[in-house]
């Protein structure tokens, strides 16, 4: 009798497997993404608000990076208007490739650029993720609206992880 039951289970699994495989193939794959959110913290010297950039990947612990976005005194400006120096508008963005910057690129962008393309209508453009080498140091602290990592080693780590985990999405929360 036990032999028959084992055979029935094997038969059941064999006939159900193709249906399960088809069902799994039609479900969207869960992928890594970045999420940017406000914190209550500020940089000690310049007063820039610190935003948390979190890398979320299925099956691994979330990684947090301290960033700035916009200028300290422009945090409440219209986030959809160009030239306001406000933080990124809330919404979903597509990430471009990780690009190394060279000596002819602006020093305030640091060594790496990851372009951002809004997936919603906005007056903002030329946005990206980069190092803010002036963060908490002088009047250049903050960005014109991009996401600026505060620490060089974290920017390099983030760029490596974005490439390795094939991150394609940034979600900016209110």
Give the predicted meaning of each segment:
Residues 1-7:
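Bacterial N-terminal signal peptides that target proteins for export
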Residues 138-145, 159:
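A short acidic/glycine-rich loop-to-helix N-cap element
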Residues 19, 145-147:
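Sequence contexts marking disulfide-bonded cysteines in secreted/extracellular proteins
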Residues 160-174:
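A short beta-strand-loop micro-motif that forms or neighbors metal/cofactor-
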Residues 20-141, 153-154, 166-168:
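Cell wall/extracellular polymer interaction/catalysis modules
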Residues 7-15:
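Bacterial N-terminal signal peptides
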Residues 14-23, 174:
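Polybasic, low-complexity, intrinsically disordered segments
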Residues 148-161:
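Low-complexity, intrinsically disordered Gly/Pro/Thr-rich segments
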């Amino acid at each position: 009798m036990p032999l028959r039951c084992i055979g029935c289970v094997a038969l059941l699994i064999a006939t159900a497997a193709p249906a399960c495989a088809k069902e799994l193939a039609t479900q969207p794959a869960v992928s890594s993404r970045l999420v940017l959110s406000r914190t209550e913290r500020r940089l000690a010297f310049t007063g820039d608000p610190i935003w948390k950039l979190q890398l979320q990947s299925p099956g691994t612990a979330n990684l947090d990076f301290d960033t700035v976005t916009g200028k300290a005194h422009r945090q409440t400006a219209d986030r959809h208007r160009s030239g306001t120096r406000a933080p990124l508008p809330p919404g979903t963005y597509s990430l471009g490739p990780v690009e190394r910057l060279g000596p002819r690129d602006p020093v305030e962008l640091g060594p790496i650029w990851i372009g951002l393309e809004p997936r919603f209508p906005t007056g903002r453009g030329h946005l990206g993720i980069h190092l803010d080498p002036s963060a908490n140091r002088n009047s250049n602290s903050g960005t014109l609206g991009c996401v600026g990592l505060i620490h060089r080693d974290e920017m390099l780590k983030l760029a490596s992880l974005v490439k390795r985990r094939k991150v394609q999405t940034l979600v900016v929360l209110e």
